[in-house]
Curated annotation (Swiss-Prot):
Reported cofactor(s): Mg(2+)
Domain of life, per lineage: Bacteria
Pathway: Carbohydrate degradation; glycolysis; D-glyceraldehyde 3-phosphate and glycerone phosphate from D-glucose: step 3/4
GO BP annotations listed: canonical glycolysis; fructose 1,6-bisphosphate metabolic process; fructose 6-phosphate metabolic process
Keyword Zinc part of the UniProt annotation: no
Location of this chain's protein in the cell: Cytoplasm
Organism: Bacillus cytotoxicus (strain DSM 22905 / CIP 110041 / 391-98 / NVH 391-98)
Binding-site residues, Mg(2+): 103
Lineage: Bacteria, Bacillati, Bacillota, Bacilli, Bacillales
Repressor listed as a keyword: no
Reported regulation of activity: Allosterically activated by ADP and other diphosphonucleosides, and allosterically inhibited by phosphoenolpyruvate.
Encoding gene (name): pfkA
UniProt-recorded name of the protein: ATP-dependent 6-phosphofructokinase
């Protein structure tokens, strides 16, 4: 393989630039040319493709976002549209493609693979919801952003003796809420993977108040439902002074953590190795701190599973 492409797709995550850098430098080290595809699958279809050199990826390892930009491209679900993308790849002499992104990006890579073009998926999403890897690129940075925000909110919650409901990202996965809530000692953590009883949440808050607790933190993954509605129910049932904070897109930005930079570098380089070995249709990951790769079709057939033991621990420690 003499020429490969790389793109980022879907929601951005801190560390994507480190992954791009690793792909480019690993490939060039092995005398393989690299072409960057801008704006994800949309750029692939339109032919927004440029050759990347060593200097193209200088001074980006510490930067959030993605140098290649990103976009969502629902029309890529159409086989005829994907064929246009494959034609663009062949036009530029590209023989393999590294796709950095989340579940939707993997779906695109899977479809390209099924249409005969070799792709390798690299997990880049703050949600940490990609099967086949313990951690995704961007999760650690987003987690630390959330923890920093909750630390600050707890300061004001303590000062004003308030209850705060804090909504974090995670439409289908509660990893950010669970890890941040546990790390910050949240009184309650609500995630999409676990049912909850609002009466139980209220009862726990009241028990805390009865033993002298003056403030509380509830961390809610967005997939659970409206944090505003939850806050209203709490205030109506308890008369506690309650505030709601939705952290939003601040979770996606910022300089990637050391862990995300290293993870992205390892995964990006491994993706290139797989293409060099002629192994398309794979996705890379890390499990027990060891690099792994899986069939991308089989990986997508699996479901991300929350750490139930950790969730139970959070409940036991927040009595």
């Amino acid at each position: 393989m003499k020429r490969i492409g790389v793109l980022t797709s879907g929601g951005d995550s801190p560390g994507m630039n480190a992954a791009i850098r690793a792909v480019v430098r690993k490939a060039i080290y092995h005398d393989i040319e690299v072409y960057g595809i801008y704006h994800g699958y949309a750029g692939l279809i339109s032919g927004h493709i440029e050759k990347l050199e060593l200097g193209s990826v200088g001074d980006i390892i510490h930067r959030g976002g993605t140098k290649l930009y990103t976009a969502r491209c629902p029309e890529f679900k159409d086989p005829a549209v994907r064929e246009k993308g494959i034609e663009q790849l062949k036009k530029h002499g590209i023989e393999g493609l590294v796709v950095i992104g989340g579940d939707g990006s993997y779906q695109g890579a899977k479809k390209l693979t099924e249409q005969g073009f070799p792709c390798v998926g690299v997990p880049g999403t703050i949600d940490n919801d990609i099967p086949g890897t313990d951690f995704t690129i961007g999760f650690d940075t987003a987690l630390n952003t959330v923890i920093d925000a909750i630390d600050k909110i707890r300061d004001t919650a303590t000062s004003h003796e308030r209850t705060y409901v804090i909504e974090v990202m995670g439409r289908h996965a509660g990893d950010i809420a669970l890890w941040a809530g546990l790390a910050d000692g949240a009184e309650t953590i609500l995630i999409p993977e676990a049912e909850y009883d609002m009466d139980d949440v209220i009862a726990r808050l009241k028990r805390g108040s009865e033993r002298g607790k003056k403030h509380s933190i509830i961390v809610v993954a967005e997939g659970v439902g409206s944090a505003i509605d939850i806050g209203k129910k709490i205030e109506e049932a308890t008369n506690f002074d309650t505030r709601v904070t939705v952290l939003g897109h601040v979770q996606r930005g910022g300089s990637p953590s050391a862990q995300d930079r290293v993870l992205a570098s390892r995964l990006g380089a491994r993706a290139v190795e797989l293409l060099m070995e002629g192994k398309g249709g794979r996705c890379v990951g890390i499990q027990n701190n060891k690099l792994v790769d899986h069939d991308i079709i089989e990986a997508l057939a699996q479901k991300h599973v929350i750490d139930i033991d950790m969730y139970q621990l959070s409940k036991e420690l927040s009595i």
